[in-house]
Amino acid sequence: TMKSSDEILMDKIMKVVNEHLDDPALNVEMLASEVGLSRVHVHRKLKELTNLSTRDFIKNIRLQQAAALLAQDHKLTISEIAYATGYTNLSHFSSSFREKYGMSPKEYMNQHR
């Protein structure tokens, strides 16, 4: 089946987000310039397709990736996982993580390892 332009755009957006996930500077401006659209356009499209703001969309993917690493990667520390997913501040990472998953990164790690 042919992909719709929305699907193609989402693929591009996901690719950019995944490639830059460890970069704290990843934001709507960077995303827009990488996919070649205006900031407003990217923001509106994401809102329409995911019901999230660009900021929340990026944050969600960061946290999903962090959760996957916490569950799987036995060699990485919580700090390393925070940095790997673009957080520069550990307490900010922990509070964002707790907000989404209802437990601290450490609790999550202990439950899944």
Predicted segments, located by residue:
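Short, Lys/Arg-enriched, Trp-marked, Pro/Gly-tolerant hinge/linker segments that flank
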Residues: 1-11, 33, 48-56, 60
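…primarily DNA-binding HTH/wHTH and HhH modules…
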Residues: 95-113
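Inter-domain helical "communication" segments and dimerization helices
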Residues: 1-23, 110-113
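Basic, amphipathic alpha-helical hairpins
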Residues: 14-26, 46, 50, 68-76, ...
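Terminal helix-turn-helix DNA-binding modules in bacterial transcription factors
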Residues: 48-88, 110-113
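Append "Primarily bacterial transcriptional regulators
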Residues: 29-37, 42, 46, 80-88, ...
